[in-house]
Design a protein with these regions (language model features):
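Conserved lysine of the Walker
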Residues: 14
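Small-molecule kinase domains that catalyze NTP-dependent phosphoryl transfer to phosphate-bearing small molecules
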Residues: 144-163
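Conserved nucleotide-sensing/catalytic segment adjacent to the nucleotide-binding pocket
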Residues: 31-34, 40-88, 103
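Post-Walker A helix-loop "phosphate-sensing" segment adjacent to the P-loop in P-loop NTPases
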Residues: 23-31
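Post-Walker A alpha-helix
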Residues: 17-18
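The conserved Walker
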Residues: 10
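ATP-dependent NMP and nucleoside kinases share a basic, alpha-helical "lid"
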Residues: 92-146
């Protein structure tokens, strides 16, 4: 089994790299664990306050669950991967059944941040891109896929992502 970690800033092209890796391997041999699926549940936080959560900080993730799931897959056990809604900024009750495969890809902005998780990886990739190009990609993605306004994306970029 090969475990690959792919990290990089928001809009850097991580998803494109993941897609190219998956396309280059035989069908059915790869399982993708998006780090976003492991955001801590914030359903207890009032809706208006969820917009103030820094989802690009290591504290936003449930590292212990992600590490446990990777270990289980490595042991040949299936997992129930959490699901996350960008629209409500909460973990959803539904899970996705994931069976072990020959290649596990862990993808996310901070996928290489946690020491325990990083030690499980056989290959670590950091994707970098021009900041202006990243901003354009983030605006395009977040407006279409996540229901945000361009103004909200720009505000988040200047307040959280750029610094």
């Amino acid at each position: 089994m090969l475990i690959i970690g792919i990290a990089g800033g928001t809009g850097s092209g991580k998803t494109t790299v993941v897609r190219k890796i998956i396309e280059s391997l035989p069908a059915g041999e790869v399982v993708l664990l998006p780090q976003d699926s492991y955001y801590k549940d914030s359903s207890h936080v009032p809706v208006e306050e969820r917009q103030n959560i820094n989802f690009d900080h290591p504290d936003a993730f449930e590292w212990s669950l992600l590490s446990r799931h990777v270990a289980m897959l490595r042991e040949g056990k299936s997992i129930e991967q959490p699901t996350y809604s960008y629209l409500t900024c909460t973990r959803q009750p539904e899970t996705i059944h994931i069976a072990p495969r020959e290649v596990i890809i862990i993808e996310g902005i901070l996928a290489l941040c946690d020491k325990k998780l990083r030690s499980m990886m056989d290959l670590k990739i950091f994707v970098d891109a021009d900041p202006d190009e990243r901003l354009i990609r983030v605006i395009q993605r977040d407006v279409v896929e996540r229901g945000r306004t361009a103004e909200a994306v720009m505000e988040r970029y200047t307040r959280i992502l750029k610094p």
